[in-house]
Amino acid sequence: MLSRKKTKNEVSKPAEVQGKYVKKETSPLLRNLMPSFIRHGPTIPRRTDLCLPESSASAFSASGDGVVSRNQSFLRTPVQRTPHEVMRRESNRLSAPSSYLVRSLADVPREYGSSQSFLTEVNFAVENGDSGSRYFYSDNFFDGQRRRPLGDRAQEDYRYYEYNHDLFQRMPQNQGRHTSGIGRVTATSLGNLTNHGSEDLPLPPGWSVDWTMRGRKYYIDHNTNTTHWSHPLEREGLPPGWERVESSEFGTYYVDHTNKRAQYRHPCAPSVPRYDQPPPITYQPQQTERNQSLLVPANPYHTAEIPDWLQVYARAPVKYDHILKWELFQLADLDTYQGMLKLLFMKELEQIVKLYEAYRQALVTELENRKQRQQWYAQHHGKKFLS
């Protein structure tokens, strides 16, 4: 008897397992991991409009209390609902896109469970003084579980659904009812889920926040007309030599230890003069006391013996400079000879000045002598004429 080969559709279908599925405990570490579609959003078209096969649908309906998918199929007749229920489901569907709703509690990291922004978006409620937290989930929450891609991930999807279903079973029965205005999970942007630390940082002057059509948060720099995905003060650290100081008197400011100054503006933020605040602290550099008098160091070449050839070179005309091969000297020797030439030049200037000074003194002496002679001549010749 010939064996019939399996077609592609039959190979892709998950194998049916007879019996009851056993719940697999999800590791707490894996629950804290955020899936990639929450961090970055859907980057490729997801096949979310496909309907579940009958085999998987029966497995879901056994533990899902008869939840029916929102997508209509020609193989099954649509479920008859009351007009009030249809209007409520349509309002929830339009208020939050299903592609950005939180799929399950395991998809959200636990550290956001205690943050204020996530609490408001999951809609905790406290009624009649009861401090116990009440969870309310919309129909989109269950529809998102039914619309996940099929294939080799069918058992994983069932594990997520069973985990959420067990959470509902552990809740009291009186806490599962819907209240007005709380039975809807709002569409949380990706920027709110990933940038909780940047919300605490203030935006520099000229910056604003906006969201894309898909709900991703970005920052606009109106000073340079540019956009950025990350916070302007979060993506860059402090430059070397800077320190952030949190003072109860002056607030948070930044200190530049290199230039000894302080400012409120982040050193990496763009400077807008009309928005810049005055510095919190004015540094006054301490003047060092001069205990010792400043002494000019003596010229070491005053006592050095100057070579004869260097004295000849200093007095020789410029046309003989090519005779010396300066490239044969070492650099240290050239520095030494340069200092000696400066010393000879200073001595020559000193000698010239002394010669001019001696000449000036001789002129002054000659003038004084001539004046005395004229006075003496005038006195003696005057007495001779009078006698």
Curated annotation (Swiss-Prot):
InterPro entries: SARAH_dom, Sav, WW_dom, WW_dom_sf. Residues 323-370 form the SARAH domain. SMART domains: WW (SM00456). The modification Phosphothreonine is found at T212. It is found in: Nucleus; Cytoplasm. PROSITE patterns: SARAH, WW_DOMAIN_2. The keyword Repeat applies. The keyword Cell inner membrane does not apply. One of its GO terms (biological process) is epithelial cell proliferation. One of its GO terms (molecular function) is identical protein binding. One of its GO terms (cellular component) is cytoplasm. Keywords: Cytoplasm, Nucleus, Phosphoprotein, Repeat. The modification Phosphoserine is found at S95, S138. Phosphorylated by STK3/MST2 and STK4/MST1. Phosphorylation is not required for SAV1 stability and may increase the number of protein binding sites on the scaffold molecule. Residues 201-234, 236-269 form the WW domain. PANTHER family: PROTEIN SALVADOR HOMOLOG 1, SALVADOR FAMILY WW DOMAIN-CONTAINING PROTEIN 1. Regulator of STK3/MST2 and STK4/MST1 in the Hippo signaling pathway which plays a pivotal role in organ size control and tumor suppression by restricting proliferation and promoting apoptosis. The core of this pathway is composed of a kinase cascade wherein STK3/MST2 and STK4/MST1, in complex with its regulatory protein SAV1, phosphorylates and activates LATS1/2 in complex with its regulatory protein MOB1, which in turn phosphorylates and inactivates YAP1 oncoprotein and WWTR1/TAZ. Homodimer. Stabilized through interaction with STK3/MST2 or STK4/MST1. Interacts (via SARAH domain) with isoform 1 of NEK2. Interacts with ESR1 only in the presence of STK3/MST2. Interacts with WTIP and AJUBA. This is Protein salvador homolog 1. It comes from Rattus norvegicus (Rat). The gene is Sav1.
